[in-house]
């Protein structure tokens, strides 16, 4: 029934995702990746296209399925002034390492004003 058709397939897929991350962490301490496949939408615009809104977090889904710690930080703006995010992904129980790396990155990158703030204030 549904257990075999969906749940077991989902568990197998989850295991494959975790194995892929394990293989990467055998070589690397941390993975840096975009936080989303596109820049942030303008306020209210994502409600007009629910599929686009759903797909905007696709880059974080595998990390969550694998049960890995990650943190996303502002990385800059696109040519239209919309924010772009950077994701720091760590192996299991490496939260301290990714938080330290994200903090160091933010110190080097400098202040990133919120949308309601003016640049330099």
Question: What are the language-model segments listed below?
Answer:
Residues 1-22, 26-27, 50, 65-121:
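Structural helix-boundary/capping segments
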Residues 36:
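Short glycine-/small-residue-rich Rossmann-like dinucleotide-binding loops
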Residues 59-62:
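Alpha-helical transmembrane segments of multi-pass membrane proteins
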């Amino acid at each position: 029934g549904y257990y075999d058709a969906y749940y077991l397939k989902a568990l197998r897929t989850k295991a494959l995702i975790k194995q892929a991350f394990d293989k990467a962490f055998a070589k690397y301490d941390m993975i840096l990746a975009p936080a989303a496949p596109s820049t942030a939408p303008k306020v209210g615009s994502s409600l007009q296209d629910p599929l686009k809104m759903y797909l905007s977090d696709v880059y974080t889904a595998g990390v969550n399925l694998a049960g890995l710690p990650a943190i996303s930080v502002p990385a800059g703006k696109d040519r239209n002034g919309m924010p772009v995010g950077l994701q720091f992904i760590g192996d299991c129980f490496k939260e301290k390492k990714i938080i330290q790396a994200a903090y160091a990155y933010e110190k080097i990158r400098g202040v990133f004003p919120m949308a309601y703030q003016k640049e330099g204030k």
